């Protein structure tokens, strides 16, 4: 076994090229200004080669090329069916967004909410665009995608049927910022049809880079009004949904179940001895409004002073209406709130800095997709992130009822923590599935995902620095957890005492594969790191202890080698097959070592394409060591190990690898049954031996730290 006392360590350093000044990433490499200048110089309007105006841009099923809805569709530029098109007529407002025939109310309700805050809107819809001077048929929008902003360029050819826009339109028929934004979103995800069905928080996050939260409503949910009032005051985007199992259904009161509404305002007042709490909502259809109490035509408005009535009530079929809180709780099931990201908000109101950590990861079948049950056999394989909360929140004195997130909705002044309460830290965790909407055309949809939060006791802290501690996970106390649901974004606002925690994001089912982004927010100081290992190898793993060959084995080598006294790969395969025969008789390490693996062994331990007796002696020492390690993890003597255990087996063999490298190895060396046999294990260990020996050439004495750029390491450790 490897002693682990002397090591060679690979330290990865930045390549030095940098990633620019942090500006938006150009989607498909398209630069808006460069395209616009080229089109103006040539006098030819832009046609987008990356998202051609045609059947494929519409969709793949109900909007597919042969579908009924795609018949008669023409792609036209605004000036071809509108006399005086404008990008923006005066100012953008929430009535600019009216839904068309596409079931993307979730996206449009979010866009309508965005118009309430010009500072946010102009980040998504860059100013200075139009159909007059400098018009070249090209527009651009900026959308947040999984940790950074992306600049998306589109041409202005829009789907039109019978002279009218098929999808989103503005109340002002000559205004086109909303249809072009919708097209940019369609391009980002592959087609218009993939936007059918969704949740407002998905669009909220893409428009702001914020964190979406879902509040599930009941008739007696406390603090909803305070939370919504506080959220809108903080420029959060807010939406509400009346759930339905049968699609969009209109109720007798003028609401649409299964439909997304924007929440755009709140108002609290007293009528006599009665407190009235009103919410302003908007249907993105731009029509079909609430007809119950406090609707546009309700006589209750006549009870108000004229100045109140004039300030609040606009009698117009624009989809916007007021309703009382109790009616809201009766008819709506969920509220979706998007808290803005530190980048958008800037410094916190208290003057301190915002703290955010972003991690990119992936669940891989047979490696780290261990399911959602902490007691399950493979749960420990899931990605893990260590979170340390250092400073508790300051206590808030509520001036209203307790908010639904433990006072989150309160707007009172901050004060010192009151006696008897355990100080706690507020941390917002956000888990996002990456790029799943783009895969709808292939029949894939969102996985059921979520996360657990476990507390790490002080006595185990020193052990929790590498994946070797994963076996301790089942014994930890769970401090919190999110819901597990089939949404792109799953978030939870946690209130935890200062201390050390383990965040474990997972898919619900073992073996589900997806890319994910985990974000951790707090106003107070915290640290967060992925549980990972430093890439290193014990020198004992690279230098097998000298042990003379058995006479019979040495004689067999010489017989096969002939006069040259060296073996090629085919001869080595024969020799190993004969030598391992006793092991196969005991059903340990069954099967043959293939020719390709033998070629790899010759390359690693020999010179050129040949293997001398001395080299074979070294190779045989490694093979015996690897066989002992393999047998330890082949507990049922089946000749295979679970691919999830490959990392543990490699660690036992003296190789300590980070998550990315282990994932690459697992994907390469597992079979279709997620098993690793002895030959695959030998090939993997030989490859690692070769890599680390190559790195040791840069060291005096073969021990110490080798610094490589990511590009250099990629060249050395390519597993394709």
Curated annotation (Swiss-Prot):
Expression localized to the cortex of the hair follicle during the anagen phase of hair cycle. Ca(2+) binds at residues 634, 636, 638, 640, 645. Residues 342-541 are annotated as: Domain III. Its EC number is 3.4.22.-. Residues 45-341 form the Calpain catalytic domain. GO terms for molecular function: calcium ion binding; calcium-dependent cysteine-type endopeptidase activity. This is Calpain-12.
